[in-house]
Structures are given as C-alpha cells and as structure tokens.
From Swiss-Prot:
Transmembrane reductase that uses ascorbate as an electron donor in the cytoplasm and transfers electrons across membranes to reduce monodehydro-L-ascorbate radical in the lumen of secretory vesicles. It is therefore involved the regeneration and homeostasis within secretory vesicles of ascorbate which in turn provides reducing equivalents needed to support the activity of intravesicular enzymes. GO terms for biological process: ascorbate homeostasis. This is Transmembrane ascorbate-dependent reductase CYB561. The keyword Acetylation applies. Its cofactor is heme b. The chain crosses the membrane at residues 18-38, 53-73, 87-107, 126-146, 160-180, 200-220. It comes from Ovis aries (Sheep). L-ascorbate binds at K81, K85, R154. GO terms for molecular function: metal ion binding; transmembrane monodehydroascorbate reductase activity. Residues 39-52, 108-125, 181-199 are vesicular. The modification N-acetylmethionine is found at M1. InterPro entries: CYB561/CYBRD1-like, Cyt_b561/ferric_Rdtase_TM. The gene is CYB561. Binds 2 heme b groups non-covalently. Its EC number is 7.2.1.-.
Amino acid sequence: MEGPASPAPAPGALPYYVAFSQLLGLTVVAMTGAWLGMYRGGIAWESALQFNVHPLCMVIGLVFLQGDALLVYRVFRNEAKRTTKVLHGLLHVFAFVIALVGLVAVFEHHRKKGYADLYSLHSWCGILVFALFFAQWLVGFSFFLFPGASFSLRSRYRPQHVFFGAAIFLLSVATALLGLKEALLFELGTKYSTFEPEGVLANVLGLLLAAFATVVLYILTRADWKRPLQAEEQALSMDFKTLTEGDSPSSQ
C-alpha cells in the first residue's frame, strides 16, 4: 500500500517569476503613491484631494491584489485546496472593498465639484470592469466555496472562471492605463509633449503596470506551473469520469 504522496516541488523558475511579479506590483503601488504625493498634493477624503483616493485604491485593489489573488493557486501548490480557495476568495474581497472606496471617492469628488459622471471611455471601462469583477466573485463563491454546488457543475464552470478571471485582470490594467493617460491630459494638456517630469514618471508607471500584468499572465499560462492535483482531488476526478464520462476537472 502506497504512503501519502510527498509534496510536489515548485518548478525551478516559478519562485523567481513570482518574486519578480511582487517586486513589480509593489513598485507600481509605491510609484502611484509617489506620483500623487509629488505632483497631485497627496490624498485626503474631506478635501479637494479626495479624487486622488481613486487611482491609488484602484491600483491597489483591481491591479495588485487581484493579480495576487490569481497567483494563489501557483504559489500555494501543496496546501489544502480549501485553504487556497478561501485565500483566493478573501484577496478578491479585499480587492473589491478597496476598489469600492476608490469608486465612491471619484463619484463624491464629481458631485462636490459639479462634474459630469460616466462620459469618458475610462469611466465606461471602469464601471464594466467593476461589475464584471463583482459578478465573477459572486459566481465563483456560489460554485467553489458555497457547499451546495455539485462537483459536476464546478468542473464544467471552472474553465470559464479561470478565463474570465484573467480577462478581468487584463481589462483592469488596461482601464488603469486609460485613466492614467486621461489624468495626464487633463492636468498637463499640451505640456505633456514637452517631457514634463510628471509625464515621464507617469509613463514609467504605465510601463510597470503593463509589465506586472505580463508577468502575472505568463505565470498563469504556464501549464507546467499549475497546482498539482492532491490525492483527494484525484479520487474525485476519477469518480466523476466514471459516473459521467466527462473530462476530469483540471486544477487552477
């Protein structure tokens, strides 16, 4: 009789890519704060600086934390599946709450200043991304954390969940880039083309946002870096194939 399976070692390059992604993500958050502090006066809720809460919260929530939530199944390869599910879900909750604060901040700022809402491409994309993110979390909770969902439903929905998770993350980064460009054009106008220090800093920030998204998506698309099936998952997978003659669920 075989003993318990030993933990699968992490692929050699995976820890380095994960560490690089975290370095990029933290740099993006720090540089966003530096941009707002150096050129936009900082952040505050009860003042004209309330708008600055918006970009910082969106970068922390819908870019950095969402990206980290997607990496949970690559980083925690040998922990119990339930534990990784809960961590994956909690990171999305934190991302949602922080993004919600950012969304409230921009609407409150517009209301106080008498500005129009939801007229730009950035705002349309932002509302779409926020709605998709919330819907994805609700459906994911219903299928993978709520005990009532059947194994067959989970296995059939999982590919869609994985795809839309990556797609929403990519759309979040694209929306952040749109917002960054919009903020620069509003503030700098024609001076943007004269290599103003703020414009250069923001351009570097945009490149780092794109780099963070690229590294995260690369980690997610490497099939050999997926979380290996644990013993109980393999047993459920075999039972499901026997009963339904369908495909066994792949790990995220």
